[in-house]
């Protein structure tokens, strides 16, 4: 009897050990799979997720790459408690394969980390750096903004349109200049007012600026490129019964009675493609600087709302778009 009990006890212990070994093997297998995935970190702008524009679009590009390709990713939202520099430092210490930063506003902080970790690969969106370990994606956003200007010039009844930008940085100055030249291409008598909020994350400020442009400057179409600040502006433009043009993503749902179109800067597509290229090229980029525009379908407009172009206007729009896309017409950008 005692012998049978010893046998049963031995079998129980053996089974328990077997299960532990199998579990350990399973965990090791999962860890091995995780180790083979490319690790990507992204540092957003201070506005963070929920801007329904720049940050959200970039984030969605990585979500798609995560869901369809062999990557895992994490993100940081700079704040009072976490600077962009500290966020880049964190990802670098954790040895992420690729660290992405958004816009010219994080350039200085990224360069500090890149200089400290020369073997770490970085990718900067909407700006460029001379450092060898910082690749970049820039957009000829002035081309898409030129198209937005054409629509604004055709839609304006007052011959007075506006541009409302977030911060006066080089990328947005390109937006402004492309927009102005598009307006004047179809409406040479129009005046174009440009206002910068100095903030991408203040919806109330956007509302105030839009109201001022409409009531004091008699602007009836405003191109808004201001992140969360722009969300407030769009709501106010609609409340005032005027027209707006959105940016980065299709913002029609934010002001359905006001939005004529949105200038798409396909950041999600460009980041998705860049990550795949990084993986395919064994964690390097074939080109240090990637610049994309209309010809690459990196920028463009959504469908039109609240406006119908005449046959003549549509022909004018198509002809001007072809000339910009082919390089026949050049947009002048002042430094």
Segment roles from a protein language model:
Residues 20-24:
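C-terminal motif of bacterial Sec signal peptides marking the signal peptidase cleavage site
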């Amino acid at each position: 009897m005692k012998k049978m009990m010893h046998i049963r006890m031995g079998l129980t212990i053996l089974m328990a050990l077997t299960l532990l070994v199998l579990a350990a093997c399973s965990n090791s297998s999962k860890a091995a799979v995780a180790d083979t995935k490319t690790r990507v970190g992204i540092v957003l702008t201070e506005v963070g997720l929920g801007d329904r524009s720049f940050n959200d679009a970039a984030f969605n590009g990585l979500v798609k790459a995560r869901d369809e390709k062999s990557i895992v990713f994490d993100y940081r939202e700079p704040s009072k408690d976490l600077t962009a520099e500290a966020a880049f430092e964190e990802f670098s210490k954790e040895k992420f394969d690729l660290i992405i930063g958004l816009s010219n506003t994080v350039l200085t902080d990224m360069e500090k980390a890149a200089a400290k970790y020369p073997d770490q690969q970085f990718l900067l969106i909407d700006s460029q750096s001379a450092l060898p370990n910082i690749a970049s994606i820039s957009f000829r956003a002035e081309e898409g903004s030129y198209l937005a200007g054409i629509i604004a010039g055709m839609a304006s009844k007052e011959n007075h349109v506006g541009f409302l930008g977030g911060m006066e940085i080089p990328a947005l100055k390109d937006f402004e200049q492309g927009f102005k030249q598009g307006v004047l291409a179809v409406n040479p008598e129009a005046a174009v007012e440009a206002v910068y909020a100095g903030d991408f994350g203040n919806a109330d400020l956007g509302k105030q600026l839009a109201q001022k442009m409409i009531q004091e400057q008699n602007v009836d179409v405003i191109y808004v490129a201001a992140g969360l600040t722009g969300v407030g502006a769009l709501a106010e433009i609609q409340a005032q019964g005027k027209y707006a043009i959105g940016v980065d993503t299709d913002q029609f749902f934010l002001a359905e009675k006001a939005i004529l179109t949105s200038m798409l800067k396909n950041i999600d597509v460009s980041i998705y493609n860049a990550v795949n290229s990084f993986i395919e090229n064994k964690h390097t980029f074939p080109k240090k600087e990637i610049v994309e525009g209309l010809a690459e379908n990196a920028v463009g407009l959504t469908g039109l709302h609240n406006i119908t172009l005449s046959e003549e206007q549509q022909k004018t729009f198509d002809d001007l778009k072809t000339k910009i896309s082919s390089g026949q017409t050049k947009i002048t950008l002042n430094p």
